[in-house]
């Protein structure tokens, strides 16, 4: 019987993975550990592997997999910047991802957390906790229908986000290297700077690559409309975090919401209760009154989890049986 290791298992995924195995006549072994130099030897008797990595995979894992006859790694996220695709190819390892698992879930997160900042919820909550129930100009908002929203990246998630904002009646500008002609309710601009210059809300939905690395830094924030709101449910490396904090502090941004952080791997998805966080930048984000931080959880719905579990396992089995899969990356 074909054997697949399901690394990075969370409690709510285990039953889904085992049920998939029964339906597909595959022996699925679940493990809470991640694929790494320390765990790769567990795969000696396996045919395939799926995992959910957040940090960079060590280089020595690829030749080890090749020596064990394993032909693939099925990543259970859309992001894949934790893999060296060229090195994997050199060792005959097919890397795959799950490019679409519930774009609407992430879009709903992006809009809902932006609305918290639009309606000044963090400020209102602090005032209420201090028993200040007065109405002040500082907590007055304006309707989204009177706002301009910039969508940076109009793939599946960006497009779904744009459609929600269109339902509010917002004016929508966008930038994407490959414009989507079906999104006739928005206006594409020739550059990111042009797209954001009049935006009240900026919503980021771009992959992590050389072009997007620190795309939003001080130079980009200099082109932002004063008092704008920034939401990042894309990849942490898209933002230069110290520059983001500075932009909020000096009033360039009214506030920001980030679901991803460039150096999140050591912390996000882990329970850090009663432990010291050594990352001073992360602490500054968490403690900032006008920055909302969530732990890479924008995708987290029952539909998305089911699709990620099955997407990873389906890709692994496809490569085992046919040497390729629809979602291969290299």
Swiss-Prot record:
MF term (GO), any: NAD binding
Could you say which EC number(s) this protein's record lists?
Answer: 1.1.1.28
- Reaction(s) catalyzed by this protein? (R)-lactate + NAD(+) = pyruvate + NADH + H(+)
Q: Name the family the entry cites.
A: Belongs to the D-isomer specific 2-hydroxyacid dehydrogenase family.
- What is this protein's record name? D-lactate dehydrogenase
Q: What is the lineage of its organism?
A: Bacteria, Bacillati, Bacillota, Bacilli, Bacillales
Residues engaged in binding NAD(+): 156-157, 176, 206-207, 233-235, 259
Coiled-coil-forming residues are none
Sorted alphabetically, which SUPFAM superfamilies does this protein's record hold?
Answer: Formate/glycerate dehydrogenase catalytic domain-like, NAD(P)-binding Rossmann-fold domains
List, from the UniProt record, the residues annotated as the active site of this protein: 235, 264, 296 (proton donor)
Covalent S-S links between cysteines: none
Q: Which UniProt keywords apply?
A: NAD, Oxidoreductase
Q: Does the keyword Glycoprotein apply?
A: no
The record, for InterPro entries, names: D-isomer_2_OHA_DH_cat_dom (IPR006139), D-isomer_DH_CS (IPR029753), D-isomer_DH_CS1 (IPR029752), D-isomer_DH_NAD-bd (IPR006140), NAD(P)-bd_dom_sf (IPR036291)
* Top-level taxon of the source organism: Bacteria
Q: Does the keyword Oxidoreductase apply?
A: yes
């Amino acid at each position: 019987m074909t054997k697949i290791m399901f690394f990075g298992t969370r409690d709510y995924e285990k039953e889904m993975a085992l049920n998939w195995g029964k339906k597909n006549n595959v022996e699925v072994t679940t493990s809470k550990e991640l694929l790494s130099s320390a765990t790769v030897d567990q795969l000696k008797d396996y045919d395939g592997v799926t995992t959910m990595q957040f940090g960079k995979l060590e280089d020595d894992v690829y030749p080890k997999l090749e020596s064990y006859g394993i032909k693939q790694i099925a990543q259970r996220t859309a992001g894949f910047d934790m893999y060296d695709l060229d090195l994997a190819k050199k060792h005959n390892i097919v890397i795959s991802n799950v490019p679409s698992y519930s774009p609407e879930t992430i879009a709903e997160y992006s809009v809902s957390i932006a609305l918290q900042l639009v309606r000044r919820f963090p400020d209102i909550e602090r005032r209420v906790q201090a028993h200040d129930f007065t109405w002040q100009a500082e907590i007055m908002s304006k309707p989204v229908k009177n706002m301009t929203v910039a969508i940076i990246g109009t793939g599946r998630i960006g497009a779904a986000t744009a459609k929600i904002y269109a339902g509010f009646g917002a004016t929508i500008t966008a930038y994407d290297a490959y414009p989507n002609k079906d999104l006739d309710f928005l206006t594409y601009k020739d550059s990111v700077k042009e797209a954001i210059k009049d935006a009240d809300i900026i919503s980021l939905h771009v992959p992590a690559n050389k072009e997007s690395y620190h795309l939003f830094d001080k130079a980009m924030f200099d082109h932002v409309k004063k008092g704008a709101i920034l939401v990042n449910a894309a990849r942490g490396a898209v933002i230069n975090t110290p520059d983001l904090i500075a932009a909020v502090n000096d009033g360039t941004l009214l506030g920001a919401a980030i679901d991803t952080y460039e150096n999140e791997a050591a912390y996000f998805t882990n329970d850090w209760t009663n432990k010291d966080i050594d990352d001073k930048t992360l602490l500054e984000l968490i403690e900032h009154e006008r920055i909302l931080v969530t732990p890479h959880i924008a995708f987290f719905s029952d539909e998305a989890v089911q699709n990620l579990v099955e997407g990873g396992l389906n890709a692994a089995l496809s490569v085992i049986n046919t040497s390729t899969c629809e979602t291969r990356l290299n």
